[in-house]
Amino acid sequence: MSPRRSPASLTRPSAGRDPKKRILVICEGVVTEVQYFNGVKDHFKALPVDIAHCDVDGWGRDPLSVVKEAVRRRDKARSAARRQRDAFLAYDETWAVVDVDDHASLDEAIRMARGSGINLVISRPCFEIWLLWHYQDCPAALTTRDIQRKLAARLPNYDKHLPADFPYRDHQRAERRARQADPDHTAPNRKGRNPSTNVWLLVNGIARAGREEKRQ
């Protein structure tokens, strides 16, 4: 993970204010991923989690662009923390969420994430495999179209938007299926086999943030 490095110049504004872990999540997808992680955030009541998608003019959306955006936003928050002398404005963890698909920039994105302290989670072939694992086993290799077809069978009106009753509570079941499909895909900044995802690492991080929030 990427712990926040608090410069000596940063101070806590009040003695009675307890630290809360802040998490930044940058998604490659504009709709589904953002909607899912906002749902997870609400499910765990993890207030100090900020979720956004990569939307930078001239970059497009590919794994390298997502990692660059994660670095940019994290560093911007660090600068604000220094400027305002408030360590709580910085992020403790920064995550980027991408697919394998046919992206030529994925290997470069992994290298940049490792060198920049970004936790890059990668789904193969696409993020929807994680959603599908909330519902059913799916151990065999699949194309993105295969997964979308199977997900549409579970969600008849699925059009990238998740229903209000999506089973976020079944994330542990999805994690178990992901671990069974690729037992080695248990750390950020690596590619897994088809199918695979390590999104559960981020979901567990959001869950921890929610538990810490309740203890405040």
Task: Give a label for each model feature.
Residues 24-26:
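Conserved beta-strand elements of the Class I
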Residues 1-4, 8-22, 34, 38-55, ...:
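C-terminal accessory helical subdomains adjacent to catalytic cores in phosphodiester-
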Residues 29-33:
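Short acidic, Gly/Ser-rich segments with clustered Asp/Glu that frequently serve as metal-coordination loops
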Residues 56-83:
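A broadly used, surface-exposed interaction patch
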